[in-house]
Amino acid sequence: MSDERYQQRQQRVKEKVDARVAQAQDERGIIIVFTGNGKGKTTAAFGTATRAVGHGKKVGVVQFIKGTWPNGERNLLEPHGVEFQVMATGFTWDTQNRESDTAACREVWQHAKRMLADSSLDMVLLDELTYMVAYDYLPLEEVVQALNERPHQQTVIITGRGCHRDILELADTVSELRPVKHAFDAGVKAQIGIDY
């Protein structure tokens, strides 16, 4: 490709991008969903949260399912004022106790609702929330109501497989991660600093 053709192509791209940027005038918080069966939902969410903290934004995190074991995200972000609330039972496939899992979910959900009502929080990350709805630990209607009633400027990030269609419809941005290849399938153990 000649330099002239390259410049012309890039100019067309610039015009399209500039037109889209000019159309985007609404300033408000958004709902972002990272879903699908591929790796990287939590990683993408925490990358966005880290970016927000780097710009001086106030962020709160609620982790469903993952338990209280240490993880790199928490080690990095808590010293920067990010509040973490974690479902105490951990992986529900380990506990296999619906009653205690539901109670633990409801307890940490109270913190999530508090954060979703807190106008001082610029962002709330609800890691693995989709499972709580899918497993009927939380009523969908209650989750949707809390999302709808949050402060206007607050952004919410939701992660997890199998996101309910009502939450997908409510979301402004949805990314579905698709598995192509995963080291775990080849027998490679989850690695500190990579997977948690």
Curated annotation (Swiss-Prot):
GO molecular function: ATP binding; corrinoid adenosyltransferase activity
EC number: 2.5.1.17
Lineage: Bacteria, Pseudomonadati, Pseudomonadota, Gammaproteobacteria, Enterobacterales
Annotated function: Required for both de novo synthesis of the corrin ring for the assimilation of exogenous corrinoids. Participates in the adenosylation of a variety of incomplete and complete corrinoids.
Coiled coil spans: none
PANTHER family: CORRINOID ADENOSYLTRANSFERASE
Entries under InterPro entries matching the protein: CblAdoTrfase_CobA (IPR003724), Co_AT_N_dom (IPR025826), P-loop_NTPase (IPR027417)
Protein name per its UniProtKB record: Corrinoid adenosyltransferase
Primary location: cytoplasm
Gene3D superfamilies in UniProt: P-loop containing nucleotide triphosphate hydrolases
Family, as annotated: Belongs to the Cob(I)alamin adenosyltransferase family.
Keyword Methyltransferase: no
Root EC class: transferase
GO cellular component, as recorded: cytoplasm
Binding site for ATP: G36, N37, G38, K39, G40, K41, T42
Pathway annotation from the record: Cofactor biosynthesis; adenosylcobalamin biosynthesis; adenosylcobalamin from cob(II)yrinate a,c-diamide: step 2/7
Keywords: ATP-binding, Cobalamin biosynthesis, Cytoplasm, Nucleotide-binding, Porphyrin biosynthesis, Transferase
